[in-house]
Regions:
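Acidic donor-binding loop of glycosyltransferase active sites
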Residues: 183-187, 352-365, 377
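Catalytic binding pocket for nucleotide-activated donors in carbohydrate/polymer assembly enzymes
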Residues: 360-436
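Conserved catalytic-core segment of nucleotide-activated headgroup transferases in glycan assembly
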Residues: 118-127, 242-336
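Conserved active-site histidine-acidic residue motif and adjacent donor-binding/catalytic loop
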Residues: 166-174, 321-325, 338-350, 364-365
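C-terminal amphipathic helix plus adjacent low-complexity
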Residues: 7-13, 18, 26-42, 421-548
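N-terminal subdomain of nucleotide-sugar transferases
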Residues: 2-159, 309, 526-548
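A short, active-site helix/loop in glycosyltransferases that binds the activated sugar's phosphate group
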Residues: 53-69, 226-251, 326
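Nucleotide-activated donor-binding/catalytic signature segment of Leloir-type glycosyltransferases, i.e.
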Residues: 156-161, 325-344
């Protein structure tokens, strides 16, 4: 079962998806180039973000754009960025703390209360407060940080700032971010979204503290390769893409940092709360709904329904998806022994009662898998040998054969785990020890020290990008998967997300166009231009005087 078994017509269709996405990306990137040629650098940066946002959600067959990277590097050296700041009320932090500690500036786009990306930052901070001071700048953050993240930052002696609360102008944000780096940081860690252009504009000149790109979105297109002195890749399959397809000069593995989990509550108590019989074998899976979408011969729902139907003592708990559609149908087929619970924050009760963890496919969920594996649960998943970046999760788990290569192997191994208690306990213990060795201190710290040792003393822009990889099954798989899970993600959606960042006059033009094509309220909210409206009137008035 793999993409190689698809018919040639299916493969041709996936290649057409790549070409379709690439054409639309190129049109958006050209608009950024046109804006640069017209001298409107603010508009150029926004259109670069729009193009990157579209490519992030509708894979175009490549992971980096030399055209956009070069454009953003030219903006980085323009007077609009290199000039002095004209924000007299801005207080650039100056470090006055423990000078024996290295200062790390974490640049994020946004922080989230759920999801592994933000937790990675928090755990990295908490693991290293003995030798690092950590601060955060958010390029699009407007709401407060999750309390556990803000607490980690301040406990280390650091601070946090949100650029949207200072200015709506992306060029000014880039200048401010550059000043934060020069005035405070010893090292910069990038955790930004794939479409965030600010790091490239801010750090697109030689000199200053080195820049580390934490590659948390290693399977999709992204900006920033030209300003990364070192890539910190979370897994080997992502590292392979960074080296061949992103032009990474140096890539080092940095496993996702974890913390020692609390002791498990006796499973009898957890099962009692969930009204589950103590003799049942509990299967658990946790992931976003889209990761279970059937594609390319990989059908999680059909596969696990067959397992639960075969083994009457098995109950599957599904956390993430809603109880609807195929999930609801599957539950009915096995008389309710598949329980679909939606999104939940109280994950511990499910960890405590589970016997076996089923990783999602065709799109695996690394953070969830590591969290449960660290608790001693045996993990099983289905590997995609043709498009490994979506299922080959972690350098610590491969040799333990947690992820098998065929549906038949999956059914056999999972069946044995359900029927053989000692076997699953042995597998769980093996899984836990492997994860502990790389994801907890002191083992994890060995990787971090290797990453830090690879950083140069001074930042140097990576130009030109050296790309050697070609389009492969990873690309076609993602293109087809996007077509199912991101079918509604159009050019208009990407424009609508970023239009408020454009200069006022251009926003007005888009609004008029949008009223005919898309919902104008999404394209240009009123609050997006009220702040610039008075300045626009003044400029128009002065321009009219000049014509008289």
């Amino acid at each position: 079962m793999s993409l190689s078994t698809d018919s040639s017509s299916d493969h041709d269709r996936l290649v057409e998806h790549l070409a379709w996405a690439a054409d639309r990306f190129n049109a958006l990137a050209s608009r950024a180039g046109d804006a640069e040629q017209a001298g409107d650098l603010r508009s150029a940066v926004v259109w670069a973000q729009i193009a990157a946002d579209f490519a992030w959600h509708r894979h175009p067959g490549f992971y980096v754009s030399p055209f956009l990277e070069s454009l953003l590097l030219r903006v980085a050296t323009s007077p609009e960025i290199t000039g002095s700041l004209c924000l007299p009320d801005l207080k650039i932090p100056v470090f006055d703390g423990d000078h024996s500690k290295t200062r790390i500036l974490h640049v994020i786009t946004k922080a989230y209360a759920t999801g592994g990306h933000t937790r990675l930052i928090e755990r990295l901070i908490n693991n290293t407060t003995d030798r690092y001071v950590h601060s955060i700048v958010g390029t699009e953050q407007e709401s407060p940080l999750p309390p556990w993240l803000s607490s980690a930052v301040t406990s280390s002696g650091g601070w946090y700032k949100f650029l949207p609360l200072i200015t709506t102008n992306l060029l000014k944000r880039a200048r401010i971010l550059r000043q934060f780096r020069y005035n405070w940081a010893d090292i910069v860690f990038l955790h930004t979204h794939p479409s965030d252009a600010l790091p490239t504009v801010s750090f697109g000149i030689d000199g200053g503290p080195p820049v580390l790109l934490v590659n948390h979105a290693d399977h999709v297109f992204g900006l920033g390769s030209t300003v990364a002195d070192v890539f910190a890749d979370l897994r080997l399959s992502g590292q392979a893409v960074s080296r061949a397809r992103r032009g990474a000069r140096i890539s080092k593995i940095l496993p996702i940092p974890l913390i020692e989990p609390p002791n498990r509550t006796p499973d009898s108590l957890a099962r009692e709360k969930l009204h589950i019989d103590r003799d049942s074998v509990i299967l658990l899976t946790i992931a976003s709904s889209y990761k279970y979408t059937a594609f390319g011969g990989y059908d999680f729902i059909a596969t696990v329904t067959e397992v639960v139907a075969r083994h009457k003592q098995a109950i599957l708990l599904v956390v993430g998806p809603k109880a609807q559609g195929r999930w609801l149908e599957a539950s009915r087929r096995v008389e309710g022994r598949i329980r679909v619970l939606g999104r939940r924050n109280d994950l511990r009760i499910f960890h405590d009662c589970a016997d076996i963890y089923l990783d999602s496919f065709p799109f695996a969920s690394l953070t969830s898998m590591l969290d449960v594996g660290l608790r001693g649960l045996p993990v099983i998943g289905l590997r995609n040998p043709d498009a490994p970046i979506y299922t080959d999760l972690d350098l610590t788990l491969g040799p333990s054969q947690t992820h098998v290569g065929s549906r038949d192997e999956y059914l056999t191994l999972l069946g044995k785990m359900i029927e053989d208690e000692k076997f699953r306990h042995d597998k769980g213990r093996e899984c836990r020890e492997r994860i502990r060795g790389s994801h907890l201190v002191p083992g994890w710290d060995v990787y971090l020290r290797g990453v830090m040792a690879a950083l140069p003393k001074s930042h140097r822009v990576n130009r030109p990008l050296k790309l050697c990889g070609k389009t492969d099954a990873n690309d076609t798989f993602l293109a087809g998967f996007n077509d199912l899970t991101e079918a509604g993600y159009s050019v208009d959606v990407s424009i609508g997300k970023h239009a408020r960042l454009l200069p006022f006059a251009e926003r007005g033009q888009l609004l008029l166009q949008g009223l005919r094509k898309v919902d104008g309220r999404k394209l240009l909210p009123l609050k997006a231009y009220l702040g610039e409206f008075p300045r626009f009137l003044v400029k128009s008035f002065l321009a009219s005087l000049g014509k008289k």
